[in-house]
Amino acid sequence: ACSGGVVGRVQLKVNTGLSRNGAPEAQWAEFFALAKSLQDQGSIIVTGLWSHFACADEPDHPANEQQELVFRTAISHAEAIGLEPEFKHIANSAATLWRPSAHFDLVRCGISIYGLSPNPQIASSRDLGLTPAMTVKATVVNAMDLPKGAGVSYGHTFVTEHPTRVALVPMGYAEG
């Protein structure tokens, strides 16, 4: 942004427990201080602070309470050094539906935007008033017969319980 002559608008991600990117708590002081310094220099504007739930599709999972607490702590740390992000957000589809305390300034619906329930065992798409937004179609590019006990795909996430015919469609993770 600086070399291009523009002020970068950034949102800072903190790790609250998903452990998939974001500044870990041990680095917050340095992370927020650097962001504040760059903002004071006019290089960036910190527009948001965010994180992501690991277990929101299981509303009673204890990690949800812990992650929300850690996120609130991160907000306090950022504000204590003078950062005032306009948007603070952690809620995915499941937290949007089942954890109103985590709505903060905005929510980030993902799977529910497509009309799917984040956890059909709790509530179906229909129960939630969601309508599927698309239909996915693909061509079968290979089919094979497998014996009982054959592992399929990375990590053998599916193991045949009896002789089974499987088909490959060229889409998604590892074309499975």
Which residues are covered by each model-predicted region?
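Short intrinsically disordered, low-complexity coil segments enriched in acidic
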Residues: 1-7, 164, 176
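Active-site loop/helix belt of alpha/beta enzymes
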Residues: 2-9, 16-147
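Functionally critical, mid-to-C-terminal surface segments that flank or help form catalytic/ligand
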Residues: 133-176
